From Swiss-Prot:
Source species, domain of life: Bacteria
Protein name: Protein-glutamate methylesterase/protein-glutamine glutaminase
Organism: Enterobacter cloacae
GO molecular function terms listed in the Swiss-Prot or TrEMBL record: phosphorelay response regulator activity; protein-glutamate methylesterase activity; protein-glutamine glutaminase activity
Compartments reported by the entry: Cytoplasm
């Protein structure tokens, strides 16, 4: 089996050296070349034909975003962004994901060499899964048609979503058409601290419903979506007749914090048949066990199909475990018919 061929673009000689060391330490991949900026990278891509590109966000001569936009239009390939953990860095990284980057790695703020080497296995996984993808010229997901507003839903109704790699754009596609009468929504997307706030703010500008980073103790009214903060678990709890968000620092589950399983298990316990669970694109198995618990408690569950996923790992694991009621294309995850059936309190059979 041939090795995954990686090309790294970063203006820092230290980062290029570290990335080379990390990639070459894994037997199934090799660093074929490195470049200090996108203009050099352009020629190296033609010469070495890499399977995956790692791309620094901020560089001289041409920044990573401008290069990514041209690359995805002219020669689409899996790209993993390398970003700083800053407010500006998170906004630029979200823009990169919108343009077609499949994932991102965050640079440690201190001890870059030690921190990056500690991330070695995670970086390898972020490269390994997208390397299998066959990308077409990138066309950003079009804004879906806005769904009609129905009667305001009972505060008992709930939509919960879990995602990882490729999830930022998939979540946007699900939330953007929702009317203000939609059920309350809880979302766990694997992201580090800082990024979740920027992600929520971006969605809030694009959507009719209100979207924000979740805070401990908040209620979950209709027409509002809450995103689990980076490095914190989010659970659903109850306070008398109302749903309430619980944010905590529990240990990572499935190597993740926030974890989709943590959210789904709590929703199965406290919402049961009033909930709809959705698992979107992502690698690994986080969410599979929690999704299995949801239909046992009476909920309806939906998995994104392989054709519309960036990485089919999380939906596949949930399907294989037996917790998925229905598998649909991303464009069909949320529909007018589904909202009407939730509103009527019917079991969902799309």
């Amino acid at each position: 089996m041939s090795k995954i061929r990686v090309l790294s673009v970063d203006d820092s000689a230290l980062m290029r050296q570290i990335m080379t060391e990390i990639i070459n330490s894994h037997s199934d991949m090799e660093m074929v070349a490195t470049a200090p900026d996108p203009l050099v990278a352009r020629d190296l891509i033609k010469k070495y034909n890499p399977d995956v590109l790692t791309l620094d966000v901020e560089m001289p001569r041409m920044d990573g975003i401008d290069f990514l936009e041209k690359l995805m239009r002219l020669r689409p390939m899996p790209v993993v962004m390398v970003s700083s953990l800053t407010g500006k860095g998170s906004e630029i990284t979200l823009r990169a994901l919108e343009l077609g980057a499949v994932d991102f790695v965050t640079k440690p703020q201190l001890g870059i060499r030690e921190g990056m080497l500690a991330y070695s296995e995670m970086i390898a996984e972020k490269i390994r899964h997208p390397s299998r993808a066959k990308l077409a010229a990138h066309t950003p997901l079009a804004a879906p048609d806005t769904l009609k507003a129905g009667p305001l839903l009972s505060s008992e109704k709930l939509l919960v979503i879990g995602a990882s790699t490729g999830g930022t754009e998939a979540i946007r596609h699900v939330l953007q058409p929702l009317p203000l009468s939609s059920p309350g929504i809880l979302i766990t997307q694997h992201m580090p601290p800082g990024f979740t706030r920027s992600f929520a703010e971006r969605l809030n500008k694009l959507c009719q419903i209100s979207v924000k980073e979740a805070e401990d103790g908040e209620r979950v009214p209709p027409g509002h979506a809450y995103i689990a903060p980076g490095d914190k678990h989010m659970e659903l709890s109850r306070r008398r007749a109302n749903y309430q968000i619980k944010i905590h620092d529990g240990p990572p589950v499935n190597r993740h914090r926030p974890s989709v399983d943590v959210l789904f298990h709590s929703v199965a316990k406290h919402a049961g048949r009033n909930a709809v669970g959705v698992i979107l694109t992502g690698m690994g198995n986080d969410g599979a066990a929690g999704m299995l618990a949801m239909p046992i408690a009476g909920a309806w569950t939906i998995a994104q199909n392989e054709a519309s996923c960036v990485v089919f790992g999380m939906p596949r694991e949930a399907i294989n475990m037996g917790g998925v009621s229905e598998v649909v294309d991303l464009s069909q995850v949320v529909s007018q018919q589904m909202l009407e059936k939730i509103s009527a309190g019917q079991a969902i059979r799309i």
